[in-house]
Amino acid sequence: MTNSNLRTENHFDYVKITLASPDRVMEWGQRTLPNGQVVGEVTKPETINYRTLKPEMDGLFCEKIFGPSKDWECHCGKYKRVRHRGIVCERCGVEVTESRVRRHRMGFIKLAAPVSHVWYLKGIPSYVAILLDMPLRDVEQIVYFNCYVVLDAGDHKDLKYKQLLTEDEWLEIEDEIYAEDSEIENEPVVGIGAEALKQLLEDLQLNAVAEQLREEIAGSKGQKRAKLIKRLRVIDNFIATNARPEWMVLDAIPVIPPDLRPMVQLDGGRFATSDLNDLYRRVINRNNRLARLQEILAPEIIVRNEKRMLQEAVDALIDNGRRGRTVVGANNRPLKSLSDIIEGKQGRFRQNLLGKRVDYSGRSVIVVGPKLKMHQCGLPKEMAIELFQPFVIHRLIRQNIVNNIKAAKKLIQRADDEVMQVLQEVIDGHPIMLNRAPTLHRLGIQAFEPKLVDGRAIQLHPLVCPAFNADFDGDQMAVHVPLAIEAQTEARMLMLASNNILSPATGDPIITPSQDMVLGSYYLTALQPQMHPIEFGDRSRTYSSLEDVIHAFEDNRITLHDWVWVRFNGEVEDEDEREEPITTETLSDGTRFEQWTYRRDRFDEDGALISRYILTTVGRVVMNHTIIDAVAAT
């Protein structure tokens, strides 16, 4: 990017999540200071010094690794103020910079022994088990130091690659190997724990295995074929992302920035801390103890037990409770691990990233608005004035009603008539979006033209309810205001409720006449048994146009179910169409009248239709007139 002021979202096209290599993990946490010193490894479990209340060096809140806890001030206080920007204190080794770097600078813990990543081991499906083509139970036995696994069978005739051995079985085989009469020259190699798992994964030649699987799939069927395809899919994904299977075993653990796992002092002098700090502390303590045991060449059984405990500590850090006992803190509350923080409804993604609160939005209960058009919604004035406040202030200043923003805000608080008039001008033609959770399909959020209403409830047209799966028993809906002209245009063109009549899933209409509309349409067009059709010629019931019938009905001269003769030159479908008219009458000038059951036609001497009167009810005229007007309007 040439312009350094471009916003962050313009710096990339997409986000891709892949396995991190050990080098990448080190890269995240390791930094070289301007004085050439390499920092990043967290080696001490301490957090802060309880006397000075300053972070401990090389601990979980170390200022040398993560940056200063106060803006432009080093740990020892030698350098203060912004003029020392970028200097590394020669006494404490802390870089003088802003404290907000503690929100993104990471550290790492170099593990004394490899550990398996619990997501890939205990996830469903278990990718480690699929890749190694071994049962998950067997893989767990290896990782948690219950069984040995054969890494190289050597010359031993009873052993084979990836075979599991108990402690006793391996001791017997060792006795055979080292017996005086042993003929085994090439000794078998066995392993245990995540180190053995890492070796097995390193031995996998992905391209060769994928080729072999494709050949096997071609000649197999049923359950076996499905299993082979499952394994091939995982291997193909590893090949496509250039990831190595052994990266599922960790040599170093990233330590997330300290401001994302804070430690705060309470009123009584006590401290409240994030659970992650306790989990990291367990890992560091066990890792340091293991390193010390390896240094002093402690017995294998003690070292192995410490490795297992390190594995369990890392499991708890990544996903507490996934395997084994859940690690609990004070008052027996399970500690929140990294997985707990990011997964679920209250997790980082759904709560803070997808479901974050946004500006220019509101929320209220919905009520029915029967007088609204389908593309309209009733927006409470109190809500509208808040949502459109910047637009209203801008227009008030532009129209010289007020001189500055402060005066405009005072005027808005008083809710003067001038303000309401300006608000009406602002919202005219400015669509808003209504959303009802859960938004399960595209039609869960639609655009409407707002109409100012009194009260505090949003009014909604009853026909758009099926799309939102809404009813009026206390449901709430959120309002969002599109700001940019492009956003407003998109909302109007693509999201307006009247443009979303068909369901995107099935193609069937999702907006259909319902309840009182269906009943009203039926009542309007129904024939009353007690109302009998009238003969043609009754002047009080004969009209020259549909409009005349409507006017007579509006003047209460006729009722909805009265029969009328009305002049209508369009096509008519008779319910009981006869082959011949009931009567035919020819006049001296050559014109001809044909009387049918529900119509009377007049033809000239050439047989061309001059006029047509139809027998119908007032309700049907009203219905027909309404439909014609609606079609003409579009």
UniProtKB/Swiss-Prot annotation:
UniProt EC number: 2.7.7.6
A UniProt-annotated Pfam family: RNA_pol_Rpb1_2
Cofactor: Mg(2+); Zn(2+)
UniProt binding sites for Zn(2+): C74, C76, C89, C92
Chain coiled-coil ranges: none
Enzyme class: transferase
Catalysis: reaction(s): RNA(n) + a ribonucleoside 5'-triphosphate = RNA(n+1) + diphosphate
InterPro entries, sorted: DNA-dir_RpoC1_gamma, DNA-dir_RpoC_beta_prime, RNA_pol_asu, RNA_pol_N, RNA_pol_Rpb1_1, RNA_pol_Rpb1_3, RNA_pol_Rpb1_3_sf, RNA_pol_Rpb1_clamp_domain
Cofactor comment: Binds 1 Mg(2+) ion per subunit. Binds 1 Zn(2+) ion per subunit.
Keywords, alphabetical: DNA-directed RNA polymerase, Magnesium, Metal-binding, Nucleotidyltransferase, Transcription, Transferase, Zinc
One Gene Ontology term, aspect cellular component: DNA-directed RNA polymerase complex
Described purpose of this protein according to its UniProt entry: DNA-dependent RNA polymerase catalyzes the transcription of DNA into RNA using the four ribonucleoside triphosphates as substrates.
NCBIfam families assigned: PRK02625.1, rpoC1_cyan
HAMAP family according to UniProt: RNApol_bact_RpoC1 (MF_01323)
Oligomeric form and interacting partners: In cyanobacteria the RNAP catalytic core is composed of 2 alpha, 1 beta, 1 beta', 1 gamma and 1 omega subunit. When a sigma factor is associated with the core the holoenzyme is formed, which can initiate transcription.
Name the UniProt record assigns to this protein: DNA-directed RNA polymerase subunit gamma
Gene source species: Synechococcus sp. (strain CC9311)
